[in-house]
Amino acid sequence: MARIDASQLELSEKVIAINRTAKVVKGGRRFSFSALVVVGDQKGHVGVGLGKAPEVPDAIRKGIEDAKKNLIKVPIVNTTIPHEIIGEAGAGKVLLKPAAPGTGVIAGSAVRAILEMAGVRDILTKSLGSNNPHNMAHATIEALKSLKTVEMVAKLRGKTPAEILKG
């Protein structure tokens, strides 16, 4: 799959989680920060990145750079996703279900941020297993990567979309 050029898109970013870690040294503790950041254009492109640095702003900046390198294209049908799917990352599992227009984004913090940045307006989600923000974010991205529209499936099978829907 070709890498998506972030410079061509109008991306906005959102910090999902900031974590402080401590390294104990002879003179006390050394603190370091990690930031989990999501970037997206609300038109079907989204990416998640992790940045680590001694200061929070630097960690966020690195997270944004990393997220721009990991952009994916999300197939959106009307305002929702094409079909139900489960994404897994580590012990984190997330169930994504298409929803009727007007439902809104029913999701927890990390999953909600990613779906809103991707441009999904109506969706039902359920966190299964671990709810660690890192695993939830990566499980959501894995699920979104695996989505296929009827047209994509038809093309892969060499059939028309009508034949696929008919069964």
Curated annotation (Swiss-Prot):
GO annotation terms (biological process): translation
Pfam families: Ribosomal_S5, Ribosomal_S5_C
Keyword RNA-binding: yes
Descriptive protein name: Small ribosomal subunit protein uS5
Entry note about domains: The N-terminal domain interacts with the head of the 30S subunit; the C-terminal domain interacts with the body and contacts protein S4. The interaction surface between S4 and S5 is involved in control of translational fidelity.
Subunit structure: Part of the 30S ribosomal subunit. Contacts proteins S4 and S8.
Taxonomic placement: Bacteria, Bacillati, Bacillota, Clostridia, Thermoanaerobacterales
PANTHER family per the UniProt record, alphabetical: MITOCHONDRIAL RIBOSOMAL PROTEIN S5
Statement: the UniProt record of this protein carries the keyword Ribonucleoprotein: yes
GO cellular component: small ribosomal subunit
Protein family per UniProt: Belongs to the universal ribosomal protein uS5 family.
Record's keyword terms, sorted: Ribonucleoprotein, Ribosomal protein, RNA-binding, rRNA-binding
Primary role: With S4 and S12 plays an important role in translational accuracy.
Molecular function GO labels: rRNA binding; structural constituent of ribosome
Gene3D superfamilies: 3.30.160.20, 3.30.230.10
Domain S5 DRBM residues, every copy: 11-74
